[in-house]
């Protein structure tokens, strides 16, 4: 990894609160050594883990999840995602985190500033590449910070409408 940002330990309480309030949601918890812990797995979780072939430890409580956590990936059926996002964004402590949908059924919770835009900027700085010479391609909400920062931004025709609506994005 170029760098890694971890969720503060208080995030465990926040994650447990989401799982308790929204029983249709599950969460995968990612660690810096690529370990994954899954809490309250649902069909979306199982499909995601099957696609990624990621070894996962299934747990019954956040107390079983070691720290540090680099990302919490909530999963729910697409029709429930708006309720999940609304719940997350309405919590008073959640302004301390990045909350973004990465697909129609997945929502990422990461440390504030831990997003694709920040990482592309940091990589460009380390490599001495000027912003106007950085090209990025993205199609979903978790790509918006990266596309906003890039000197040249592109998206496929089937990208989310809010991605295609970005003024600097060129449609592929």
Report the location of each language-model feature.
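Glycine/small-residue-rich loop that forms an oxyanion/phosphate-binding "nest" at active or ligand-binding sites
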Residues: 1-12
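Flexible, active-site-adjacent loop/turn segments at secondary-structure boundaries
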Residues: 5, 104-107, 170
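Generic low-polarity alpha-helical segments
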Residues: 7, 15, 46-47, 168-171
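Conserved acidic, metal-coordinating active-site core of Asp-based
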Residues: 14, 18-137, 158
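Acidic, Mg2+-coordinating phosphoryl-transfer loop and its flanking beta/alpha structural elements
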Residues: 120, 130-172
């Amino acid at each position: 990894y170029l760098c890694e940002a971890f969720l503060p330990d208080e995030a465990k309480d926040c994650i447990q609160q989401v799982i308790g309030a929204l029983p249709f949601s599950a969460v995968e918890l990612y660690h810096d050594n690529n370990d994954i812990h899954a809490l309250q797995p649902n069909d979306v979780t199982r499909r995601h883990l099957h696609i990624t072939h990621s070894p996962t430890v299934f747990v019954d409580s956040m107390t079983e999840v070691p720290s540090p956590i680099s990302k919490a990936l909530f999963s729910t059926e697409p029709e429930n995602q708006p309720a999940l996002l609304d719940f997350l964004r309405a919590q008073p402590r959640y302004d301390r985190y990045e909350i973004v949908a990465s697909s129609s059924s997945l929502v990422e919770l990461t440390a504030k500033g831990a997003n694709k835009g920040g990482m592309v900027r940091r990589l460009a700085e380390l490599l001495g590449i000027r912003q106007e010479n950085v090209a990025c391609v993205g199609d979903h909400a978790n790509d918006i910070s990266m596309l906003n920062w890039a000197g040249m931004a592109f998206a496929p025709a089937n990208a989310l409408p809010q991605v295609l609506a970005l003024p600097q994005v060129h449609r592929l």
